[in-house]
Amino acid sequence: MENLSVNLADYQHGAGFDGAAMGQANLTADQLAELSKALEAGQLQGGDMSGNQTNGGALKTESLESSLKLITFKESDIRFWKRFPKTAAFNTVEEYNQLTSYGSDRGGFNNEGELPEEEDSKYVRKAEHVKYLGVTKSVTHQMQLVNTNVGDIVRRETTNGILWILRKADRALFTGDEKVVKQEWNGLYAQHMNNDQFANLDEYMDSELVIDLRGSVLKQENLEKGAQTLLNKFAQANLLIAPPVVLSDFATEFYAKQRVMIGGSQNANTKGMTTGQHISKFQSMYGLIDFEYDIFAAKAPGKLSVAPASSSKAPSAPTAVSADVVANDGHSKFADGIGDYYYAVSAINRYGESAMTQVGNTVTIANADDSVDLTFTATAGAYTPNAYVVYRSLKDPSTPFNKTTMYPIMVVPAAGTDTKRGSLANGVDGAAAGKVRDRNRWLPGTEEALLLQGDTDVIEFKQLAPLMKMPLAKLSPADRFMVLLYGTPIVYAPSKMIRFVNIGRNF
């Protein structure tokens, strides 16, 4: 029972605290009580400079833990960025060539002495633009002179700046989209959707490169199907990258299938057995697939309507007009979503996101071929929106709108003519100009994942310069510097990548 706690002996200074010890002092009991009251340590921090302390608090030395405790992410949490193949870029526009076909797959056998027919190979040149990530840090001269528990404060702030950049870069590998915010690079989801073989959103979502789980968890058969699809596209699936919850739910599917033999001499060690399931790879029919999780692959979490803008430079919240049910929509996917919903929308630019605005009241989907047209406009303000985030509640909410968690389901460009994304100016997913149509393609509260051939034949990050620290001119007694990253991811072969969408949870 030793070492369970400290005791009074660990705090002795001189005579101690017992009655016999106090009796050795030439003080009466009343005097001792007054002295004890006068020098009571209290719970005030030693750094209190109010000048009003009437006890021993002013004499205390602070007890500060010597090491800095992290309550945010660590470098080890940035996983996909570390795994992503990287190479040098030499221009702000990185071009690449694709050989898309050796020629048509026609008959090729000929008669003796006959001239074979001619076939032309097909080449395509494409490009991605290098984009620029950066953050400015500042440390005053005075801060550099005082003692801290973090060592060199400039080095600490440099590390913090690097981690801030890497978090943004890691997340943008998935969700970056220059058609939404033009300063962003195109992440893997954007480049996958930009595949030229699909003319519109219907063709893309119905293709074999997108596997829609409609709220179900990811299972073995989904991976096998994806691996087979990639094989038919002349690719070798070897990497699944997903948010942690997707892989956790994949593992829990095995719990009910586990068999543990308890008892018997051959199982003497089961008394301290470890349960659970760790899955690092999946053996498909066509090869091993590594499992990799990344917390920054997760979608933005749901939030309440009272959530404030994320930046003082974010646009003003949009002005809502209406949410109208559209009947007889042959492309609707509300067959599994008949019920009531709330809708909301926020505006975004390169600085951040506005507060959200409710669009309409409760919207009722009564038929499988219903869809919803949302009408809203930009609100005048100092900062113009580049795009809008559409939010939706889960089906049949039991609380009023202001107490209901709203989930982002799509991001809509403010302007543009892209046939897959659409835009508010020209209509989204079959809606008229100025409207955004929700056909239940994207389910609230779900996740996404990617299955791909994770090598330089398919993906690569082209980096214009190493991650760098650049000093700024001194305009005050402070060291200011920037942490900068220039580059862009490139998906050379979007057809060698499977996108799992609407992955649900196993609660």
Describe the predicted segments one by one.
Residues 303-444:
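Disordered, low-complexity "stalk" and linker segments at domain junctions of extracellular
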Residues 1-311, 316-319, 340, 365-372, ...:
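Flexible, glycine/threonine- and acidic-rich loop/arm segments that mediate assembly and lattice contacts
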